[in-house]
Amino acid sequence: MTDAAAVIERVRQRVDPTPAERRALAAAASRLTERAEAAIAELPVAADVVQVGSTARGTWVAGDRDIDLFVRFPSDLPREQLETYGTTVGAAVLPDGHEEYAEHPYVTGTFEGYAVDLVPCYDVAAATEIKSAVDRTPFHTTYLQEHLDDGLAADVRLCKQFLKGIGVYGSDLRTQGFSGYLCELLVVEYGGFEAMLAAIEDWQPPVVIDPAAHQQASFDDPLVVVDPTDPERNVAAVVSAANVATVQHHARRFRATPSEDAFTPASPAPLDAAALRSHIDRRDTTPLAVVLDAPDVVADQLYPQLYRSRDGVVRGLREHGFDVVRAAAWADERAVVFVELASAELPAVERHVGPPVSVGTHAERFYETYADDDGVYGPFVDDDGRYVVERDRDVRTAGGFARTELGTVALGARIESRVASGDYDVYVGDAVVEALLPEFESELAAYVDPKA
């Protein structure tokens, strides 16, 4: 047995559900289905129940306790009635559950220790005819039930655990990683987990995988996996370029040096105030934090706005002459844009380079603009033959920028409204430590010890 095979066998023992787990889940799903069918029988419309997701396809990892049931209603049913009937069935099946809202309401709750979602959808003839995003999910289950055998399903579990171990599992907009469905499609496409790693090692983004050979739509993403049930959809659309590269890095490392560590999420060492101060002192950089109460929106709406705000702040700082080492954005009860700077203060003057003297009218206009300005040094000609002036900076400190200039940079909508009202705080240097700990201890611990 090779080193890789030995490691994989040990991981299989961790991720494969036991026969008892399988029987218990199947029994619970059966009882839930019976409840749903009984509730449907009381409705004035026909509908059926299908189990979807990893537990329906046999690709769930040991310890997962999720059951997803979809109630399919006629495609001509008005949306309002679909929502009403769907939540009626959900309440009957999960009397202690509660409603949540995606594209339309569904009921979530617990049953015999399992987390259960009961979701109404339309019974359409094909995924290309969907009336709501969830309508395509049953087609995913059908497709994979036709293409997965027990061996491939077991390899999907390995794939999921591998991606969890390296921190890129999850299609939420915070993680920007790989969904369970994407894992399944990749394992099917390449014929197994090890073959998938070998293929990933050789990826040259943009990577395009078209399982059903649709060859219809084009996508502008680093990884494209065309949904075999819907040629207009890229299953990997949410996966960031950084996470594509991270998977490649770990695929290469595992194939070179197999280790169970690849399947185990890293746990950063605890970080207290003294350790954070020591890290900052050792790097001789200056941290800056813009902190505000987290907007009351779901994570998939919040994080794109946070990431846009982070990028806008970084771009604004750089445009004002600051050297940004690295930046991040986090949210809990509060939201944070965190920026590490080479220096938090700049010289009183900045160099403003104009056009080459040789370009005539444009150069003359630059010269005349500053020729009689007593507030600048110059204009003079530099060694490259360009006009240059040295002028006073509008903003000399990073803290000053964050307090007065945030309204000029691109921010997420909810962040922008808080900034416009002045409802945010700015911390620079040592003040960041007390402001962010202990609320953001895990995020800061990962930040100070970055790993691919």
Curated annotation (Swiss-Prot):
It is an enzyme of class 2 (transferase). Gene3D superfamilies: Archaeal tRNA CCA-adding enzyme catalytic domain, Beta Polymerase, domain 2, CCA tRNA nucleotidyltransferase, domain 2, Poly(A) polymerase predicted RNA binding domain. InterPro entries: CAA_C (IPR048833), CCA-adding_arc (IPR008229), CCA_tRNA_nucleotrans_2 (IPR042090), NT_2-5OAS_ClassI-CCAase (IPR006116), NT_sf (IPR043519), NuclTrfase_I-like_C (IPR011068), Polymerase_NTP_transf_dom (IPR002934), tRNA_NucTransf2 (IPR015329). It comes from the Archaea. One of its GO terms (biological process) is RNA repair. Pfam families: CAA_C, NTP_transf_2, tRNA_NucTransf2. Mg(2+) binds at residues 66, 68, 117. CTP binds at residues 54, 57, 140, 160, 169. GO terms for molecular function: ATP binding; CCA tRNA nucleotidyltransferase activity; magnesium ion binding; tRNA binding. Its cofactor is Mg(2+). Keywords: ATP-binding, Magnesium, Metal-binding, Nucleotide-binding, Nucleotidyltransferase, RNA repair, RNA-binding, Transferase, tRNA processing. Its EC number is 2.7.7.72. It catalyses: a tRNA precursor + 2 CTP + ATP = a tRNA with a 3' CCA end + 3 diphosphate; a tRNA with a 3' CCA end + 2 CTP + ATP = a tRNA with a 3' CCACCA end + 3 diphosphate. ATP binds at residues 54, 57, 140, 160, 169. A single active site specifically recognizes both ATP and CTP and is responsible for their addition. Belongs to the tRNA nucleotidyltransferase/poly(A) polymerase family. Archaeal CCA-adding enzyme subfamily. Homodimer. Catalyzes the addition and repair of the essential 3'-terminal CCA sequence in tRNAs without using a nucleic acid template. Adds these three nucleotides in the order of C, C, and A to the tRNA nucleotide-73, using CTP and ATP as substrates and producing inorganic pyrophosphate. tRNA 3'-terminal CCA addition is required both for tRNA processing and repair. Also involved in tRNA surveillance by mediating tandem CCA addition to generate a CCACCA at the 3' terminus of unstable tRNAs. While stable tRNAs receive only 3'-terminal CCA, unstable tRNAs are marked with CCACCA and rapidly degraded. This is CCA-adding enzyme. It comes from Halobacterium salinarum (strain ATCC 700922 / JCM 11081 / NRC-1).
